[in-house]
Amino acid sequence: MTSEMQLQAQIDVIEKENKELRRRNEELGQTVECQNKQIVTQNWRLLFFASSWIVYGIVSAIKYLWG
């Protein structure tokens, strides 16, 4: 096998590995995007829950002080 053929074989292997890495990278990107959407949804739920308790506490304090 000539050095040119060896180089071509190495290039073929590298291109195949590169293609596989790009595919895996795309899959990971989609997974991360999906997880980010879930986290954002959870954050909004927590924010709503916390803010409702804060409002409840403020209203209770006002009723207690003025009631």
Curated annotation (Swiss-Prot):
Keywords: Cell membrane, Coiled coil, Membrane, Transmembrane, Transmembrane helix. It is found in: Cell membrane. It is a single-pass membrane protein. Residues 1-40 form a coiled coil. GO terms for cellular component: plasma membrane. Its main location: membrane. The chain crosses the membrane at residues 44-66. The keyword Transmembrane applies. This is SPbeta prophage-derived uncharacterized protein YopZ. The gene is yopZ.
